[in-house]
From Swiss-Prot:
This is Small ribosomal subunit protein uS2. The keyword Ribonucleoprotein applies. The lineage of its organism: Bacteria, Pseudomonadati, Pseudomonadota, Gammaproteobacteria, Alteromonadales. GO terms for cellular component: cytosolic small ribosomal subunit. One of its GO terms (molecular function) is structural constituent of ribosome.
Amino acid sequence: MTTVSMRDMLQAGVHFGHQTRYWNPKMKPFIFGARNGVHIINLEHTVPMFNEALAFISNVASKKGKVLFVGTKRAAGEAIKEAAISCDQYYVDHRWLGGMLTNWKTVRQSIKRLKELESQSVDGTFDKLTKKEALMRTRELEKLEKSLGGIKNMGGLPDVLFVIGADHEHIAIKEANNLGIPVVAVVDTNSAPDGVNYIVPGNDDAMRAIRLYTTSVAAAANAGRGQDLAVQAEQDGFVEAE
């Protein structure tokens, strides 16, 4: 089972919150104190809470569930994308489009258009167009890929959202809440943990902290999928001989 230790978190700077003047009182239970005007997050809470979240994500993945990684802050985008790809899951790393979950029917049409343009770009269709028309379609393809590339193969709503930065991704969290999709989120001292089912109190800006969260969630999802494949193999009678 994937777990993260106190030492891992200390080394990644998970315990450094925001300046005290920006705090959200709803995070008080998770704050240890302040140092040089910066809130220090109590890792005695964060360690077990994150490990509980990892166990939940692993369980979802073991049942063929879909995990949607969400992190559109500049510091989070790249790590979110890499982690999701590494565990064959899905991501939104650029901008959350309002209605991405709650208006899935419309989003599905846009994904269909994205896939059409992708095949046109490789089957020679673009070459038969005028220069201007080809350029317009290329731009449309790039725009759709940027917004929807990470969810184009999701094939339906996700089973869990993993979010870096609850305040920044409040629209995504609200949409998940409306649809009853559980949310795991990293919540810093300047944010409200409202609507988050699995709160991970921690720094949501430092690259090392973000990488720790994303790689751990990817490892948990991979472990869950491995469990699922092992069960499947057993059911199919493909159990390796000792």
